[in-house]
Amino acid sequence: MNKNSNPPYTSGSLPTGEGGGRGRIILDIGNSTVVIAYSDAEGNIKDIWRLKTIKGETISFFRRELRAALYNFGLLKKDGTLEKIDNIVISSVVPEINDKVTQAIIDVTGVTPHFFSLDDAQKVINIQIESPSQLGKDRLADAIGALCYYGAPAIIIDMGTATTIGVIDEKGDFIGGMIMPGVKTSLKALSTKASQLPTINIEKPRHFIGRNTLECMQSGIIYGTASMIDGMIDRIIPTLGEDVKIIATGGNAHYVISYCKHDIIIDKYLQFKGIMKATK
């Protein structure tokens, strides 16, 4: 969990308050992290709660984390009363824990969550790729968020466990993209496979041309990734024409994007915006 909280302990679903709902809960189940977001009735993300994605965890674990998140959001009161929630939506790329998370949500809130789907996405955006069903839900949501909030054509960079690039053409169609190892994934591979390379934190090196192993690794991962992104953008833009919007999101974007030469907008809530647009 990401903040210290002591929510009231309850063993089953919580009593709900009277009146209209206080907003929506959106869960993004990613390969490394589960992010729980609270959106108000107007669609504004008010707060988020993070926990690690661990496939072997139990329903009880997810119940505890959900209660802690709701308490942190101000939806679970000290007396154990839960404010009414309009709906709960899940976007997941980790099917192994979907059933556990679903049961935890039902146990705590009494609400059966809706899973963001390809059908939801296709109501908002035209997907012009082979086998749309194989496209990750995170990339679908990113594309919808970019199209609805920034317009077309657009390039979307999502920097998580993998670094993905999505492309929306001038007609507003999603036409494909690229998938590469993520920043932390690359670093982990280096330290795992090369016995003399240490595990490091992602920080800007003191010198661009590294003067020791630490600086060399930091420079390689930060400036190397930034240069890769710039290079991919340079190759994509000629296929899209003018006035291309470039948007970055994901947990690792803030480490790298400021070192890119292109003008790139960082929108940390892009995926949630897309999910809300597709499931409203």
What are these model-derived regions, one by one?
Residues M1-G23:
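Intrinsic disorder/low-complexity segments
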Residues N2, G23-A68, D173-P198:
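Short glycine-rich, Thr/Ser-proximal phosphate-binding strand/loop in the N-terminal lobe
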Residues R24-D28, V89, A154-D158, I247:
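Short glycine-aspartate micro-motif
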Residues T33, S91-N98, E242-C260:
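Glycine-rich phosphate-binding loops at beta-strand->alpha-helix junctions
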Residues K55, P205-K245, N252, D263:
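Adenine-nucleotide phosphate-binding core of ATP-dependent small-molecule kinases
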Residues L66-N87, M232-V244:
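Phosphate/pyrophosphate-binding loops at sites that engage ATP/ADP/AMP, CoA/4′-phosphopantetheine
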Residues V111-F115, V124-K193, Y223-M232:
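Phosphate-binding/catalytic loop of phosphoryl-transfer enzymes
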Residues S195, I264-K280:
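Glycine-rich phosphate-binding/hydrolytic loop that grips phosphoryl groups
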